[in-house]
Amino acid sequence: ITWLNFKVVKMCLPGIFIVTLLTLSIPAVHGGKVLVFPQDGSHWVNMKVIIEALHSRGHSVSVVRPSDSWYIKETSPHYSSITIDIPGGADEEFFQRGNSAWTRFSLDMELKDGFFEIHRKVCEMIIKMLENKQLMQSIRETKYDLVLTDPLNGGGVVLAHYLNVPLVFNVRWTIGGEGHFVIAPSPLSYVPIPAAELTDKMSFFQRVRNFLVYIIRQYLYRQTMGPHYSALVSRYFGPEVDYLSLFQAADLWLMRVDFVFEFPRPTMPNVIYMGGFQCKPAKPLPQELEEFVQSSGVHGVIIMSLGTLIGQLPHDIADEIAVAFAQLPQKVIWRYKGDRPATLGNNTLLVDWMPQNDLLGHPKTRLFVAHGGTNGIFEAIYHSVPIVGLPLVFDQTDNISRMKVKGVAKVVDLATLDRNIFSQALQEVLDELHKDVPMEPLDTALFWIEFVMRHKGAAHLRTESYRMPWYSYHSVDVMVFLLTVVLFTLLAFIGIIRCFCCRSCLKMKMKEE
């Protein structure tokens, strides 16, 4: 795999850049006051990076959290907490219940009702805050300079509008879908919907698929989120206010991706890209782990983690993975919380937790087996480690698909995984492995100049829009096709009814005669 035909060294700096932007948004005399309404779970990991950086620059940060928060601690040297005595709705048990189904479709269906409940509880949390006069008086007297929120839930948006303070997003996903589709022009003719698993180069029927997936997803988002937030916004701001318009009015969108990851697409001036901002150089490993890694010799190590939500796998799948690992000369570090697989080889170490970033940055790491979460994807990009993806839910399938298109990942479907399929994917990536080294800014400029010379251009950075006729760009042909299908179906239905009626009338006439 040729690593970083698309790697951009700016990923080393975005954390500092983003904090600078936030700093410019806040009066700098004695440091600003930031009210944070985060999303619990893995999203808190990258929000915490920004919070710690803001604190280090002298800003005062307050974090709103539910009393049963899964990740967000009540006490911290970097922020003060505003704890609301109400369940937040998302916990580890909720996601583990979802793991009983091991196909993406069935798992999505199991989680749909759960997310409906999560957003209901977020709205209850906001109502409890706004109805607490003493709390709101204290918040107003604090005179926060801005609200920083993850718009995967709408609590921070409503709070910022209620307090009439600037709103900044730490964003990839919103309650209305992927962030770009809420704020920026997104022609469906060449901008793929994440759930469609397509690229920016689509055939006619792929564009039909993209169009249909968009319609279905918008319907599902409105069914899952809409009832709660529409009622909440109507209650406090009036029925004429649309909750999505409050999202679109955000001052700044700090997008947790960049064009290393994204396909070329339109954007907006207030969208700031910070893909990989949470990435950092590797720290030394604990002694026992370092000894295990060093024992791999010239073959190196493979690390596997399916994130915080999926700690264990069904026994049959775990056994197939273990067999495939046992056949390799590499050592394997596998984050796994289930029963020890019966087929586990001597080259595989099971751990409850691993310093993932530090392992990815180790010079002996050869491969990352991952579920495809955004944080892990960017850490792998940052450390130039190729990926074998086992995506299951949320944006994981799309994330891995994007990396596959760029030539740095292989995708394996858990629903069809066996030892042969998994072993083949591992071997293909290991055989093609090539690791680049980090570059200084001048080296980056020279790299891209030479890249364009070597490849006679940089076509992967240009959008497909200029190649498309106007009717394709605006999806006119797709809409005409779908309209034709609908009309044909309707005419066929009318024809069948008419035929049935004519036959009935004919029989009645024959009886009368």
Regions inferred by a protein language model and the residue ranges of each:
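Glycosyltransferase specificity loop/lid
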Residues: 3-235, 244, 254, 261, ...
